[in-house]
Amino acid sequence: MAAFVIEGGHRLHGDIHPQGAKNEVLQIICATLLTKEKVTIHNVPNILDVNNLIQLLREMGVKVTKEGLDVYSFQADDVDLDYVDSEAFLKKCAQLRGSVMLIGPMLGRFGRVNYAKPGGDQIGRRRLDTHFIGLYRLGANFAYDEEKKAYVITADELKGRYMLLDEASVTGTANIIMAAVMAKGKTTIYNAACEPYLQQLCRMLNRMGAKISGIASNLLTIEGVEELHGCEHTVLPDMIEVGSFIGMAAMTQSEITIKNVSYENLGIIPESFRRLGIMLEQRGDDIFVPEQEHYVIESFMDGSILTLADAPWPGLTPDLLSVMLVVATQAQGSVLIHQKMFESRLFFVDKLIDMGAQIILCDPHRAVVVGHDRKFRLRGGKMASPDIRAGIALLIAAMSAEGISRISNIEQIDRGYQNIEQRLNELGAGITRI
């Protein structure tokens, strides 16, 4: 098992470019199954989850060609449906959370898919109800195979209809959209997720010949078409990586410029960091973060403690709360971090407490952080990365800490961050992979 050894106290300086968005590209790659024609995708990140999904499509018979450093083409003109029925396919699906988004396109184009419960982060319950209920309303049939421990999902014909989702699930909405684009008639999805990832998926599908309206809202209308065609698509920069770099600069008192961030697609992320006292400046499509000795957390107008809580888009993404929690440990003031959407993502705070942070874990969803205002530096220590986002938060803490830290299970970080130690070391960090 690989690990990072981090020498804390190094300040960073220079420019850094965010990778392509992981949460977008997983959907986009699955959508290539909807056509037999060639689809070319630009700005594909070289990370474990994406590489594993690409390999899974290869094993399904999709022709995958790497055409450049971050450019791939996919042509699903000879999908091996026997392999999709095999135990080998189910085993791969069970290891990869992103494979859940194969259901919609496979059902929409081929009318059948077997599916094992997926893996991924251990961050609490992640229901598939929204996916399955939406697909059921389109006409899918579900059976559970006890022997294979897998769902058998079939559809003789998918028909569009109105549906009100019980939660604005990003992957659930994506699956329903991909199944509905070639269903007969009109599908209306209310309480649809509207993250930039979903907007990108819808725009790509429209370029392929789909008829989706209401993009960027929570009310989508999809007119089914007979077939989809090939296209080219460029993945957005990863907003989670952009936020991680902002937090990293603040914690290490560094001056960095984050290049080509697609600022208009960051939502309230920049403002949420500003509420923690972080100075940042938009320069065209870049973000400049100056060196900052102290930063002061805002209070609410009535003087009560600031609360940062996640919410469906355009609210604050849950994927950055771990980073914001770490940043708050060296701020002046206090903040309540409220992780509403997952119940186990705050369980890494004991590792920060061991490093000297002042954090009160109220319950599985809430933690109060009392900032040190840099009067006491965090101490280096040994820790393990429980999931992608906690892993990068621990890395940020270790980079700002006094002494040497060791983070194990860094495969979790590799799932979401491309060549992270190499890119940070080029800015002056002291990170060694062992």
Question: Over which residues does each language-model region extend?
Answer:
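Short, structured segments at the rim of ligand-binding sites
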Residues: 1-434
